[in-house]
Regions:
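Short, charged low-complexity intrinsically disordered segments located at boundaries
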Residues: 1, 34-38, 51, 86-87, ...
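Charged substrate- and nucleic-acid-binding regions of tRNA-handling and nucleotidyl-transfer enzymes
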Residues: 1, 6, 150-208
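Acidic/His-rich, divalent-metal-binding segments that scaffold phosphate/diphosphate chemistry
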Residues: 1-85
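Generic detector of well-ordered alpha-helical segments enriched in charged/polar residues
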Residues: 4-11, 16-23, 27-30, 34, ...
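A broadly tuned preference for mixed-charge, low-complexity surface segments
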Residues: 18, 24-27, 73-75, 81-82, ...
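Short, isolated positions within intrinsically disordered regulatory regions of eukaryotic proteins
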Residues: 49, 100, 202-205
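Divalent metal-dependent catalytic cores for phosphoryl transfer on phosphate-bearing substrates
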Residues: 59-167
Length: 208
């Protein structure tokens, strides 16, 4: 398996069937995946091991290169950063950062498109972000970091990720919709503020 073939597989209707059968070839291309096989996440959020969870997310997202590649890499670093607390519960601190690093190394080595690399990295870096807990300042930072199109992609990705987890938490899908609407409203407000600033500048109050 080479990079071109991998991307072709990712754009199939159900890539998981092929990737499951050819997982050893996937490891030859991206060695970090080997540790994901049968890796028990020991978390109430998850019913699948890391690799199976990744495959389900890959199937769940729309078959575009950005979403499918982001899905493949988004949790690849989980076994690397894994920590277990005294209750035997698994945690994966900053796995998004390490996963983005692994993707970036792969992407640069294989000369992937710069725009694609940037979009995939953003999805990986923000996929686990709890938008419901963000302060107004943090929401403002998100608006500056991501375009409206990228927010739409991110929430598609987050929904696909949730649907590959424990069914008990599917109720959060409604929360995701509200969170998306809330963050998108910040773009409208930001645009309106910019418009009013421009209007005042371009249409100064004339003296009588």
């Amino acid at each position: 398996m080479n990079t071109v073939e991998l991307i072709k597989i990712l754009l199939e209707y159900k890539p998981s069937d092929i990737l499951r059968k050819r997982k050893e070839e996937l490891v030859e291309l991206i060695p970090e995946f080997k540790a994901c096989f049968n890796f028990d996440q020991k978390s109430k959020w998850h019913t699948y091991d890391v690799f199976e969870h990744i495959l389900h997310v890959v199937d769940n997202v729309d078959n575009t290169p950005v979403l499918r590649i982001a899905a493949l890499f988004h949790d690849v670093a989980k076994p690397i950063v894994y920590e277990e607390d005294r209750f035997g519960v698994g945690h994966f601190p900053n796995h998004w950062t390490k996963s983005a690093e692994i993707f970036s190394e792969f992407a640069i080595k294989n000369n992937l498109d710069n725009e694609l690399i940037e979009k995939v990295n953003k999805l990986i870096m923000f996929h686990d972000l709890n938008f419901g807990r963000l302060t107004e300042e943090e929401k403002k930072a998100i608006v500056e970091a991501l375009s409206e199109e990228e927010i739409e992609l991110l929430f598609k990705f987050k929904k696909a990720d949730l649907l590959a987890q424990n069914e008990e938490y599917y109720y959060l899908l409604d929360d995701y919709q509200k969170q998306k609407e809330n963050i998108l409203s910040k773009y409208e407000r930001s645009s309106n503020e910019k418009y009013h600033i421009w209007f005042r500048w371009s249409n100064p109050i004339r003296k009588s």
